[in-house]
Each structure stands twice: as structure tokens, then as C-alpha cells.
Design a protein with these regions (language model features):
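Glycine-rich nucleophile elbow surrounding the catalytic serine of serine-hydrolase chemistry
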Residues: 102-115
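Catalytic histidine-centered segment of alpha/beta-hydrolase-like enzymes
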Residues: 369-381
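Alpha/beta-hydrolase fold nucleophile elbow
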Residues: 93-105
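Short alpha-helix in the alpha/beta-hydrolase fold that links the catalytic acid
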Residues: 328, 342-352
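N-terminal cap/lid subdomain of alpha/beta-hydrolase-fold enzymes
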Residues: 1-69, 351
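Alpha/beta-hydrolase fold catalytic core
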Residues: 194-341
């Protein structure tokens, strides 16, 4: 997708008109963002090919470039690294501390970009910022790992919708998440790894505990062989309460399906809500604030298929970049109610970047009581920008030598 989300809702000097929780309001438009990090950093928003106004163009002979030059994990990283080099050189910013930030798939992108910049462009960074990162290495791992690390998200979303047992519901969210995390790693993951070798007794014990932490019934958990898809969770959590579905990217949002029956929601209520307000805001902003007019459509999402997912070494790339650059630090920002790139999946991914734990003091994790775009909730817009500001200040070298 385009960089529109962070451009006019998070770090930029203008933000779109939404209410305190992030829902659309009319009239559409934008206003000043008093929380922008423009006071500590110059911000460059980049729209990859086929997003925003970025397009492939023909060469002098009228021949279009091949899609494989842009549409793939490694191709994407390679051309964007070249772009960053060109931009930095044109604007004479080689001496400046540099940070790259990526949201969702952008998390995969900047993990790989950190190493590509160092290895191919000889450009060393001070920080990598992951906002609700999507780690595709994790999604392609064995199902027991992915299923287990989703449980704490189930707990968070169920707590928000008051669907947990009272012993949990009466506690604060941050009191109950650590025990859900501990159960997911130390009990649920080993149990799921057993597959058909698990005993009936253990299967029932696990199903009961999963029900306790998720708000789902023990019956449906057993029907799924203990591995409940997130899509089913979004459909089922409130099925017998209000008949509504909950959002994928932000489970605070509610949807209305044609039928209460089924295994997955008809649509993503949070995404329709966001497009409702973001699309008019960015088009209005570009024309009236930036004074740029064109008949080219601003692509909120672009067609980048077929996307080459082969040879995804971005996680190892980030580790290598950190190992070879003592300055480099990482900040992760995740929303507890994000059901697509869950907060605990992000924690787990960071643990796999540095399994030795030797660089753990260079990782910072920040969680927020919102979803994928935590900055849409005004309280978290303030907090998340303050966290960015602190990270930038703390990771600037300030005369310190880059050495171990």
C-alpha cells in the first residue's frame, strides 16, 4: 500500500479529520498535527511502485520494464536502496543520522533494507523502526508456532469486548497479557507440536485453558484441533452475544455480516472505515496543501502481482546489519488489538532476529491499546510519536564511537 497512512495520520505535520478513537468524521479533510516528529527529524515518505502516484515508465524505445525488477521481496529492497542513495546524495544528507520506518509489509521491507543499504550502498543507519511488522518468515513456519503466538492477541481482543471470564476481565489488560504469553510459549506451543500424539487428557486441558484466555468455547476449540484461525476468531467471538464480527487489523471495530453463520467475516470493518476517511483526506491534502494537481489516481493500494516471495532473508539481514553496525538500534511499535500482525508475533520475531540475546539491549518494544495503526487513537498518537522522538534522541550517536 501507499505511505498515506503514516503521512497524514502519524508522523507528518498534518493529520486527517477523525474522532478521538480513529473513526471517520465529516467534513473530511485534515488539520495540523501537534505531535509530529518534524521537530527532531526531516521526514521522507516513499510510495513504492504502483502505490500513490508511483508508476513504472517506459524507456526511450517505449518498452516497459519487467515487473520482476520491482515486485518481489528482494527486488523491492534493491531498487528502494538505490532510491535512498540517490535522494540522500541529491539533498546532501550523507552526514545526517538516518532512520528507516516501515509499517506492516514495510516491516519486512526495512528489515531487509537495513542490510542492503549497508552492503550495497555503504550507508549505515542509526535506527530501524518497525510499526506493526509483518514477518513472512513467521507466517510460513510450522503452524504450531503461528497458532500459539496468536493466543495473547485473542486475549487482548476478548478483553476489549468483555468476553473473558470475570477473573481475567476484572483485571487490567496489561496484567493479564503476560500470563497469556507465558502459556502460549511454554504450554500451548509444545502441545500443538505434538499433533496427533497429544493425549485426550492433555487436549482437553489445553482446550479449556485456551477457552479461558480467548473467550471462545471449548467446543469450537476442540473442533479446530486446538488450532483456531484468526479469521474464525473474528467471526465467532461475538456470534452468540451481539451477532457482530470484529476487525482484522483493529479488533475494536465491529462489522455486520449477511449471516451470523460462517467461518470468516464478509469484510474488514476497520479497513472500510479507514478508506472512508483517508482517501478524501490525502487527495484533498495533495491538491490544497501541496498544490499538486494531476489526473493520475492516487493508489491507496496497488497491483503488485505476481510478487516474488522467494529467498526471504530479511530477518537475518537485520541481524547482520545490527552485528556489523554497533550504532544500529531497533524500535518495534505494535497495537494489542491488531489481529493481522499481532503484537506477540512481533515480540517472537524480534527474539528470532537475535536468538543469542547478545543484542537485546538494542531492541525496544512498545505496545499500544489500539490496532494495526495505533496512531489513529489520539491517546496513542501522542504516545507513539513521543516514543519515536525518544528513540531518535537516544539512538543518535552524539560523538560516541561505533565499537563494541
Amino acid at each position: 500500500s501507499a505511505s498515506v497512512w503514516m503521512h497524514i495520520a502519524y508522523t507528518g505535520p498534518r493529520i486527517l479529520n477523525i474522532d478521538e478513537e480513529g473513526y471517520p468524521t465529516q467534513p473530511y479533510g485534515f488539520r495540523s498535527n501537534p505531535n509530529s516528529i518534524i521537530d527532531v527529524a526531516d521526514i521522507v515518505f516513499v510510495n513504492p511502485v504502483n502505490t500513490g502516484y508511483s508508476r513504472m515508465v517506459a524507456d526511450k524505445e517505449g518498452k516497459m520494464p519487467e515487473k520482476k525488477l520491482f515486485f518481489g521481496i528482494n527486488a523491492d529492497i534493491k531498487y528502494l536502496a538505490e532510491w535512498v542513495n540517490t535522494f540522500v546524495s541529491r539533498h546532501n544528507r550523507w552526514e545526517s543520522p538516518k532512520y528507516i520506518i516501515g509499517e506492516s509489509y514495510g516491516g519486512t521491507r526495512v528489515m531487509g533494507l537495513s542490510n542492503e543499504l549497508q552492503n550495497s550502498q555503504w550507508m549505515y543507519l542509526n535506527g530501524v523502526i518497525l510499526v506493526s511488522p509483518a514477518d513472512y518468515n513467521l507466517y510460513s513456519t510450522g503452524q504450531p508456532i503461528y497458532s500459539a503466538i496468536n493466543l495473547p492477541y485473542f486475549t487482548a481482543a476478548a478483553w476489549y469486548h468483555k468476553a473473558l471470564p470475570s477473573v481475567l476481565q476484572n483485571k487490567d489488560l496489561l496484567e493479564i497479557l503476560p500470563e497469556a504469553e507465558e502459556y502460549a510459549i511454554n504450554t500451548l506451543m509444545p502441545a500443538l507440536a505434538k499433533g496427533g500424539f497429544i493425549s485426550d487428557e492433555e487436549r482437553n486441558e489445553v482446550a479449556e485453558k485456551m477457552s479461558y484466555y480467548s473467550g471462545l468455547s471449548k467446543k469450537v476449540i476442540l473442533q479446530h484441533n486446538l488450532e483456531v484461525p484468526t479469521s474464525f476468531f473474528w467471526k465467532d467471538l461475538l456470534r452468540d452475544k451481539t451477532g457482530q464480527t470484529i476487525g482484522r487489523l483493529d479488533s475494536r471495530y465491529l462489522g455486520l455480516d449477511k449471516m451470523e453463520a460462517g467461518t470468516r467475516p464478509d469484510y474488514s470493518p476497520e479497513l472500510t472505515s479507514w478508506l472512508h476517511s483517508f482517501t478524501p483526506a490525502i487527495n484533498h491534502y495533495i491538491k490544497t496543501e501541496l498544490n499538486f494537481s494531476t489526473d493520475i489516481k492516487y493508489n491507496m493500494f496497488g497491483n503488485v502481482n505476481p510478487w516474488d516471495r522467494r529467498n526471504n532473508n530479511t530477518r537475518d539481514g537485520l541481524r547482520e546489519a545490527m552485528a556489523t553496525n554497533p550504532y544500529l538500534k531497533v524500535l518495534n511499535q505494535s497495537g494489542y488489538y491488531d489481529g493481522a500482525t499481532t503484537y506477540f508475533a512481533a515480540k517472537y520475531s524480534l527474539s528470532q532476529v537475535d536468538p543469542s540475546g547478545k543484542m537485546k539491549d538494542r531492541f525496544t518494544f512498545k505496545g499500544y491499546r489500539s490496532g494495526h495503526m495505533m496512531y489513529l487513537r489520539n491517546e496513542d498518537l501522542i504516545k507513539a510519536n513521543d516514543d519515536l522522538r525518544s528513540f531518535i534522541k537516544e539512538s543518535s550517536a552524539n560523538g560516541k564511537s561505533a565499537k563494541y
